Design a protein with these regions (language model features):
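Active-site neighborhoods of divalent-metal-dependent phosphate/nucleic-acid chemistry enzymes
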Residues: 67-129
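A short acidic, often aromatic-flanked loop/helix-cap motif at beta-alpha or helix-coil junctions
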Residues: 39-41, 73-78, 147-151
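Alpha-helical elements of the RecA-like P-loop NTPase motor core of helicases
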Residues: 16, 43, 76, 132-133
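Short, well-structured N-terminal submotif of metal-dependent ribonuclease cores
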Residues: 1-60
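Short, hinge-like loop/turn segments at secondary-structure boundaries
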Residues: 48-53, 85-86, 141-143
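Short, well-ordered coil/turn elements that cap or connect secondary structure elements
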Residues: 26-28, 62-63, 118, 138
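Short acidic-hydrophobic, aromatic-tinged amphipathic segments that line or gate anion-handling sites
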Residues: 65-73, 142-148
Length: 151
């Protein structure tokens, strides 16, 4: 079990487990919400009803101070992390990192990982491997698969 008590869902969890999340208000009440995930959900939604739902979630989490939004430092540190992954640079704690061809595609996941770590939240995702790459730079990052979380 993760050491952090609070959690946030990656965008793919909202897609895969939409009905469970919508029908379990306690989940939403106990979690933090990433503005990056909110952006991904809003930008890809087709339904006006879903967009209204996301707006309500945004307001609730903003009011509850559980909406995690990257600041200028997060953007800068994330850019450096992606650069290191892309070029296979050394990390402070893990030495050389393997070069990635798709590092630029990981920007949103990196922002989610960084803000979750700073807020002491674990990330629930289907893309454990993508998030695992960031642990060389975010040693306190905790990642939980959807199977582990939902059983």
């Amino acid at each position: 079990m993760p050491k952090f008590k609070s959690f946030l869902f990656d965008q793919n969890i909202f897609v895969e487990f939409a009905d469970v999340i919508r029908n379990t208000p306690l989940l939403l009440a106990k979690m933090h919400f990433s503005s990056v995930v909110l952006y991904e959900l809003a930008a890809t939604t087709i339904s006006a009803g879903d967009l209204d739902l996301y707006e309500r979630w945004r307001k609730v989490h903003d009011k509850g101070n559980t909406l995690l939004t990257p600041d200028k430092t997060d953007w800068w540190e994330t850019a450096k992390m992606i650069r290191r992954l892309k070029f296979g640079d050394k990390s402070a704690s893990h030495g050389l990192t393997p070069k990635l061809q798709h590092a630029h595609q990981l920007q949103n996941d990196a922002l989610i990982a960084r803000t979750a770590t700073l807020a002491k939240c674990y990330v629930v995702t289907k893309d454990v491997d993508d998030f695992q790459q960031f642990t060389a730079f975010l040693p306190n990052l905790e990642i939980v698969s959807e199977r582990e979380f939902f059983g």
